[in-house]
């Protein structure tokens, strides 16, 4: 599974932030595949493919994730920056709602405690994103 969230990196748990930073570059591997791109933000099948015409947004998102991880004191393996030219995107309310629901679901179903800046967060930590 590859996570690409719409929530600002600053509100993600440490675990979700690092997972997205690590997994987001996987989308670039799909660029040579000719299957159709979904018209709307989706989770599951088509999630990564949705971002192919939006690679500029992905590059900027990855830079934001990197900056947030560094601000939290994470030691990262250096990676070349992703390109920031190309298609842009602004998540609409529907995309934010879908993503918030998934974040809430993952946090509530977590087997181990999750953290924000090293502090354990309650299962309701992401509930404000649903409003």
Predicted features and spans:
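Extended, charge-rich alpha-helical interface modules
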Residues: 1-131
């Amino acid at each position: 599974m590859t996570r690409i969230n719409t929530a600002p990196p600053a509100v993600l748990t440490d675990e979700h932030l690092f997972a997205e930073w690590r997994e987001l570059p996987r989308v670039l591997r799909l660029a040579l595949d000719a299957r159709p791109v979904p018209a709307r933000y989706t989770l599951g099948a088509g999630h990564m493919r949705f971002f192919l015409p939006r690679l500029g947004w992905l590059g900027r998102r990855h830079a934001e994730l990197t900056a947030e991880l560094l601000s939290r004191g994470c030691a990262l393996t250096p990676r070349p920056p992703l390109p920031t030219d190309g298609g842009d995107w602004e998540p609409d309310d529907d995309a934010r709602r879908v993503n918030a629901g998934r974040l809430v679901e993952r946090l509530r179903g977590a087997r181990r405690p999750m953290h924000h800046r090293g502090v354990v967060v309650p299962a309701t930590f992401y509930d404000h994103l649903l409003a």
